[in-house]
Amino acid sequence: MSVYIHMGVRMRRSLTMALSLIIVAPQVSAEALRAGAAQSVITPELPTEHAVYLAGFGHNRVASGVHDDLYARCLALEIATPTLVVCSVDLIGLFYDDVLTIRRAFQQKAPAASFLVVASTHTHAGPDTLGLYGPKPLATGIDGRYLDWVDGRIASTAADAVRAMQPALLKLGRDDHPLLELLQGVDRPPRVKDPFLFTMRLVARSTGETIATLVNWSAHPEVLGRKNTQITSDYPHWVRAYVEKQLGGMALFFSGSIGKVSPLGDQVALLDPETGKLAEDESWRKAELLGTEIGRLAQRSLQNAEQVNLNSLTVQSEIVFVPMQNSHFRAAAAAGVFVGRKPLYSGGKLDPAKEKRDLPDLGRVEYATGHDIQTEVDYVRLGAAGTTVAEILTIPGEIYPELVNGGMARYPGADYPEAPFEPVLREQLKTTYQFIFGLGNDEIGYLIPKAEWDEQPPWLMNAAQSWYGEINSLGPDAAGSVLGALVSLIRPY
């Protein structure tokens, strides 16, 4: 048994700099697989002496109550020595620096564990953990005490999952049912979706009882809309509730390729069997129906699940420096909106420099001048009998589906109409079970194909107004930086 760890610095096209980490478990007996699960509530206390700003729809949306609790849910997988823990948290997102803080605390609590992934579901009805949704522009919405508590809570939950590990069997599921695509709305061209649903069920070897079921699907958790002021995990709440009722154990939900994919609007029409009418948009009933349907399809995917005698686990990780090309984010960084949790770098080193600049819609403001932000991508391979049987990619933001499934297009009005297309992720993957963990270990915003980037008029397809997306992206080179790093991890295998 050996673990190979390599860390180095190198230059490559589209990346400023990269650090790589490889953790390998060689093939061992199939009986060596162990799994454990744990969960904890991370809902902020209400009422409180100060406002809890809700994230996702703009400024000054203050929480008025709690509909359902927010959770950190963690699954630990171990083959021989390497232990991988994946955590899904009901938050709009966590910055990479928070994840590094969580990892340090986790290592103290579970020093033998090898690697931790923390992915946010991206609920639009949870507390602002990014700072962008405070009382007004350039005023943070982060409650530092709450966020520090959440970081510690996630670390403890991950360690609890490790302590709960027991001999386990792994079952893998996938569903391509046409309904999955109908439950996703896309307004921006090209109207490409990522409808695939992937599941992973861990069963106790001794009893046959479910330890945990992992569900991976793609749509923004924003069914309740901007008028809602109650804290909720949105439709993933009902996904998990259905799966746990049917299969037992703990359910985890991971958002996938959610860039520009929404369940809001007329594209996603859900018939309420109790009334015989369509569920109203931005309603609790629509959230319940959507989540329950995804839960049902998740259970369906496992009816003929492939039981895998897992005997190898490999984690590859790379730190990536992505150019910061968003003026609003630079102003936010300089104003303290990110409260120091998303610093800028130049040449791979922290760069706190800032200057005064005039911005069209903000006036004269402080402006951070560092070149890049630091983030991470991961590639996990699960193997059996010398063959990779399942793969996990972490995406540090909200990736447009055409970057995952293909279908990138060139339209009149694009700012970079001749830009080369980025590599398509699923074309690089080898297995039937291709898990995409969006907002994995970071939230850097939308990842948009450069050839479709449209920040200046004329707009794509001669639209009368700008398309939504660019305002919440690091810039036109972000997708290429992230996908270039991922492909470099995948291709050798």
Placement of each model-derived feature along the sequence:
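Sec-dependent signal peptide recognition
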Residues: 12-20
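Repetitive helical segments and hydrophobic/amphipathic motifs
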Residues: 21-22, 131
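N-terminal signal peptide c-region/cleavage motif recognized by signal peptidases
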Residues: 25-27
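N-terminal compositionally biased, intrinsically disordered segments and leader/signal-like regions
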Residues: 6-8, 17, 122
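Non-catalytic substrate/cofactor recognition surfaces at enzyme active-site rims
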Residues: 31-493
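N-terminal secretory signal peptides that target proteins for export/translocation
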Residues: 1-11
